[in-house]
Design a protein with these regions (language model features):
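A short, polar/charged loop-to-alpha-helix boundary motif
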Residues: 73-81
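Exported/periplasmic cell-wall-interacting domains
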Residues: 79-80, 95-167
C-alpha cells in the first residue's frame, strides 16, 4: 500500500476531515525547492517550441523574452530536440556547418551550444521570428534569435546556465 493510501485509510477510519499532501513515489522536476535544494536555480533559459518563444530569467526575474525560430518541424533530422540542457560554451564569432558535411556554412556573431549534438542558441538574420515559420522553414535544429537578443543573452549568460527546451 502506498504512503498516500495509508494516510487516507488512517484518516477515514478515524472519521477526520482533513486535507493531506500526497506522498509521491518520484519527485518531478522543480525549478526551486522549498527545502533549499536547487535543481536549476532561478537563472535559466526556457525555449517553447510550440509557441516559438524564449524567456531568459536571471535571479528569478525575467531578463528578456523573444520570438525565435527552432528546427524545421517537418524534417525529423532538423527538429529541435526537447530536453533539459545547459549552455556548453560561448563563442563569438563562430562558423556553423561545412558545405562538405552539412551542405551549408554560415557565420554567426553569438554562439551558445546547449547539447553536445551541435544544437545551440545563435543569431541569424531572418525577416521574421515566431509563428509557424519553423514548420517548413525552420533551422537545422538550432534556436535562431534576432541579433540584438542573441547579444543580450551572450553578454549575460554563463557556461552551465540551464536551458529547458519544451515541445
Amino acid at each position: 500500500m502506498t504512503a498516500s493510501v495509508e494516510k487516507l485509510v488512517y484518516y477515514i477510519k478515524a472519521g477526520d476531515a482533513v486535507t493531506i499532501e500526497p506522498v509521491y513515489k518520484v519527485e518531478g522536476f522543480r525549478m526551486n525547492s522549498n527545502a533549499g535544494v536547487k535543481y536549476t536555480g532561478n537563472t535559466y533559459i526556457e525555449v517553447d517550441i510550440c509557441h516559438q518563444h524564449l524567456w531568459y530569467y536571471v535571479n528569478g526575474e525575467l531578463f528578456l523574452e523573444s520570438d525565435v525560430v527552432t528546427g524545421k518541424e517537418s524534417d525529423p533530422e532538423r527538429a529541435t530536440p526537447p530536453g533539459a540542457y545547459k549552455v556548453w560554451s560561448r563563442e563569438s564569432p563562430r562558423k556553423l556547418g561545412t558545405y562538405a558535411v552539412q551542405g551549408y556554412e554560415t557565420w554567426v556573431n553569438y554562439w551558445m551550444p546547449v547539447p553536445y549534438t551541435g544544437i545551440g542558441l545563435h543569431d541569424l538574420n531572418r525577416s521574421a521570428y515566431g509563428g509557424d515559420i519553423y514548420i517548413n522553414n525552420g533551422s537545422h535544429g538550432c534556436i535562431n534569435l534576432p541579433l540584438d537578443v542573441a547579444k543580450k543573452i551572450y553578454d549575460e549568460v554563463t557556461i552551465n546556465t540551464p536551458v529547458m527546451i519544451i515541445p
